Amino acid sequence: YASLAERDIYGDDYFYWELYEMAEKIQKESKTAKNTVVYSEGATSLTYYEKGAWALFVLRNQIGDANFQTAVKNYLDKYGFKNVSTDEFLKEVESVYSFNSDKFKKEWLTNQSFDIKQAVFLLKNNPMIQQYLELVDKQALPFSSKKEYLLNVLTTSPYEKVKQEVIYQIHNVPYEEAKEFYDYVANSDNVKVRQAMVQVLKEIPNEYVEAYKTFLDDGSYLTQEMALKNIWYQRPDLKHQVLDKSKNWEGFNDKNLRITWLMLALATDNYYPEKKANWYKELEGYAYSKYNS
């Protein structure tokens, strides 16, 4: 129900993406020795909350929204403020819909594994997830065979997560071969897509330096921090320039940008050596817990 409340606020795409990430975590944990059986004692918190949420999502899809809501209402009216079990709830479901509760329990409540095929089938009801999964299926293909497809998705898809996945798939592609992608991101105002480029770009091409500097002006402290570090490490000739630009940055409550700046400034040769003693004292001061995030 917390996820449903978020769905009302943030929309279907957010809701389905949360379900997708839950499914990935549950699938991974179900392959370990940990107890991922919902209907048991000693299961992990991931099992109780996230696999349990998935079980309810599946149930709601199987019996329909109206029947699900009726079953929940009847259940609460009948058992409010009482100690009850899952079986009582399933009986209420059976009273409003012809439902095989034994089969549901076996597949979703007493099973160590996670039915990823059914999960993917349900997730594909959302257009964003459908396009995202189509894109993921192309991860192993050579760039030359999917370049036009990726560029079309990047420039036309309305979905932020999909655009990010495109950027992740070009992380090993030389700049000369993917120039259109780099240029598109440089001119984009989507913070998350720009952040994805900063995350994956291990070396800043000479032709992209000026465009890359614009990431320092992004409305994301994380993007700014990554861009500052990358330019400082990769372009010694620009160290003083980017430090001057970022000297008044603070960042999150944990002072991530200020602390990063101090560390880089202290490690930079011939950069205000007369101020370094004070900078070092300031950096020491940020070690106190009041600056922890």
Walk through the language-model features, giving the residues of each.
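Long, low-complexity regulatory tails in eukaryotic proteins
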Residues: 261-293
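Beta/coil-rich, acidic/histidine-enriched accessory regions frequently appended to metallopeptidases
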Residues: 81-242, 270, 274-278
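Acidic/His/Gly-enriched intrinsically disordered linker/tail segments
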Residues: 1-57, 61-63, 79-80, 96, ...
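Short inter-helical turns and helix N-cap capping residues of alpha-solenoid HEAT/ARM repeat scaffolds
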Residues: 158-159, 189-190, 219-222, 250-257, ...
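Alpha-helical scaffold segments
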Residues: 195, 225, 251, 255-271
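Short alpha-helical "patches" and their helix-cap loops
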Residues: 12-23, 67-78, 214-216, 244-247, ...
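Extracytoplasmic/secreted proteins, especially bacterial periplasmic and envelope-associated proteins
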Residues: 1-4, 50-58, 67-74, 84, ...
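HEAT/HEAT-like alpha-solenoid repeats
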Residues: 222, 241-252, 279-284
